[in-house]
Every structure is written in structure tokens, then in C-alpha cells.
């Protein structure tokens, strides 16, 4: 059960990274088409912060919590 929960967290963090990466790619490819985002640099910075946060959480789980079979 423990590994199931920790792997679910890891999958959640990986999903957050993928979503943020997709958003960055969309903003980079079609910045003009995203009308509600006036400051594209700030918007991309927010997405990069989401990636950094999720990566930090993955690192903490892998470093500090023993997990038999991490699925990442």
C-alpha cells in the first residue's frame, strides 16, 4: 500500500511536469494566440516554476522515502 501511494504521488508530479511543459510549448509556438496572457515571459516563468516544484517533490520522495519500485 505504501509503494502504491508513493507511486501515485510520483505519477501525479510527472503529470504536472508534462502539463507545464505542454503549456510552455503552446506559449512558445503561439504566443499571439493566447490573448489572456499579456506578459508571456511571466506566464512561461510560472509554468517553469511548476516544473521545478514537481521535480523537487519527486527528488524528496526518492531521496527521503523508501520506495521499493519507483515507477518513473
Segments predicted by a language model, with ranges:
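Extended, charge-rich alpha-helical interface modules
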Residues: 1-72
Amino acid at each position: 500500500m505504501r509503494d502504491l501511494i508513493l507511486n501515485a504521488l510520483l505519477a501525479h508530479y510527472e503529470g504536472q511536469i508534462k502539463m507545464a511543459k505542454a503549456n510552455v510549448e503552446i506559449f512558445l509556438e503561439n504566443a499571439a494566440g493566447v490573448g489572456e496572457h499579456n506578459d508571456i515571459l511571466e506566464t512561461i516563468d510560472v509554468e517553469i516554476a511548476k516544473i521545478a516544484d514537481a521535480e523537487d517533490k519527486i527528488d524528496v520522495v526518492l531521496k527521503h522515502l523508501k520506495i521499493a519500485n519507483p515507477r518513473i
